[in-house]
Amino acid sequence: MLDTGLYWRPLGGNNIDQISGHCYQYTCVERRENQTVKTSLLIDVGKFDNYQALGVDNAVAAVPDITALLKDRDNGLKAIFLTHSHPDHLNGLVHYLRAGYKLPSLYGGRYTQIVLEDLYDFYKIPQKQRPRFIVIKDGDVKRFGRLRVEVLSASHTCFDAYGFLLSFNKVTVYHSGDMKLDNSTFFKKPTNVKRLKQVAKKINYVVGDFCEIDHEGIAYRESDVYKKFINLIRRFRKKKIYMTVYPTHVEMYIVAFLAALKLGFNVAFHGDEDFYDYMKVLHKYGINFENLAKNRIKVFERLPDDLSQLGNKFAIIGTYRKLDDKYWINSKDVLMFVTARLRYAALKKQAENRGIKTVSVVDEPLLRGSGHAFMGDWQILKQIMNRAVYIPTHCPDFVLEEFYEVGQLAGFNLINPLPHNNMLYKFGKDEYKLVEKKPAVWLVSQKDGNMVKTLQCPTAGHGSIRNTYSKRRTLQKFKIIEYKMEKKRGV
């Protein structure tokens, strides 16, 4: 039996050695008319792609285990809030629907709703089974009994990304969602720092996106990525440009397009079906590249069979997963940008074997863009919310452990013990405590829609995704950050 108060449990936000399948439970417990009443919310229900490493075959994804919340009415699950549209925060919902579960109302941005509807269609989820979706925007306030949720815009690599302020009994939590501090975003709202400043004294806890906390400085701004593209194209003086982008990070579609437009390059989009699905989503959202061009350049939604239609100077924006020999014609006049670290080495080798000049994220880290706060972003936020207890999420456990010493040196009041999946904390106004620690559980969604329960286990080096983080490289980055901090302080 839980005492009255606000409780928080990460169900999928901190994998042992990889990140994915994010899901966080907030539960407020109160007494009403001599009865104990629970009100629970979830923030995000993502999927974990490296399901093979969990030891289950014939599968399509792994998802955090929320079955107890869905089956037990006493838990009072009222809603699921969605920070944004990326698969590791959103796609778990579809696998629960495929397995026959009924979900509560969903709250998310309009872009997230469009992506989700596309997923429903792909998995053939019947209309009557699809949960109610309430579109939210920056500044909205929703109440569930005495639990208050305020919506704050967040700058990320997709549209309509949000963080949330959750308040209950004089306890306020800022759940950041994936975000960075960037007010140069194209067609998107920046992180609502103004509102955070207004309520900073009331914020007791920050559940933060520490995905890239091992990067020093401020997260890359979209305007700087745009300028970098332009400068590199001008420097190498190539007339045929190929820009690889990560399919779900639509900000890069737009940044690459605007750079090509600025320099007068005709543009063709080319990729696999996943890439074109996101192009369709952009259209539904209202982003039309032909309209953006205003007849200044030619725009092709798909690569034409006859490349001569593109003219003498053109840029192809596409995914690294769809390449063919059309790109290698007159290779000496081609410049390829590899903006995704994933599989960049193989792609770069293909290009170099054909005599193509390649610039990758290893050469120019700025090219990959960023949707996550760096160390500098969090130091700025710490100055604003200087009374809060900071709770790192969205990163492997070893990153948390390596960050702990650096975080204390930087003045962060970090939660102790650090959060692992399925640990339950009680958040009080002046203190917190670890209430419960259980083994983390995942459900592996199989091809027939059924789900198999399995315990979390170390996954690095196993399955389809061998490594998402380098422990050695992470430690080196933290050592550099720590050295610079100590030097600045004269230690």
Positions of predicted regions on the chain:
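His/Asp/Glu-rich metal-coordinating catalytic cores
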Residues: 2-79, 88-262, 266-270, 276-295
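A short SAM/SAH-binding and catalytic strip from SAM-dependent methyltransferases
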Residues: 82
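Long, low-complexity, intrinsically disordered segments
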Residues: 485-491
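Non-globular, low-confidence helical/coil segments that flank catalytic cores
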Residues: 99-110, 118, 123-138, 143-150, ...
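Short, surface-exposed beta-strand/loop "edge" segments at domain boundaries and coil↔beta transitions
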Residues: 32-35, 323-327, 486
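Hard-cation-handling environments
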Residues: 214-336, 343-359, 367, 374-377, ...
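Short beta-strand element of the conserved SAM-dependent methyltransferase core
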Residues: 24-26, 164-166, 424-425, 432-434, ...
